[in-house]
Amino acid sequence: MHPSRSGGLSLALTLDMHKKARSGGDIPQGIVVTARREASLAEMRRALRAIGFAIPIEHRLAPTPVGSDAAVVALPDTSEVVNATGLGKDRPGSPLTDACHWPARGLTWEFSYHGELAFVDQASAAAAAPSLTVHDGWVCFIHGPARVIAKVFDVDIPMSGPAFDALSRIAIHATS
């Protein structure tokens, strides 16, 4: 299962999974999308209906972090939990409480790469017990500009390995 919060990044990730489903790629058994506002869920439903979305999806209204916790605790083991809310980056906080029970052997992904990152801190604190893998948005952030620079300047920029790690360190110092 793959829960996500509705919004631009959430819709982009969901559409990418739809594309993979259409081409026979590896996709989750289902997706759970939560949002604090019904209007956000309705907007996502309309967009997905328009393309004939190919993956089972549940839209859940979760106006509080406790409501989001309920969506996460219901997930099966090995699920991926994504924070695409902007909480921790655009404004303080996390969509979940510190008491959230994460899926065993699951994966968390915080789209944000700077700011408070409370979601990453919560997942990291829980990572030892349920064998949770925690990812922040830094590598994703670096990949986007690196691909554009490579295309514009017709240069080869590796997307992993020592050279990529060196570029990442330079970017960290430039943004600090």
Residue ranges and their predicted role:
Residues 1-22, 35-38:
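Glycine-rich adenosine-cofactor-binding loop
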Residues 15, 43-54, 119-126:
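Short, aromatic/basic amphipathic alpha-helical patches
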Residues 15-30, 125-133:
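Conserved S-adenosyl-L-methionine
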Residues 20-60:
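NAD(P)-binding Rossmann-fold cofactor-contacting core
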Residues 28-30, 77-79, 103-105, 131:
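A general structural motif
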Residues 31-33, 37-40, 59-96:
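Rossmann-like NAD(P)-binding element
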Residues 88-164:
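Rossmann-fold NAD(P)-binding glycine/threonine-rich loop
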Residues 159-176:
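A short, charged, Gly/Pro-tolerant segment at domain boundaries
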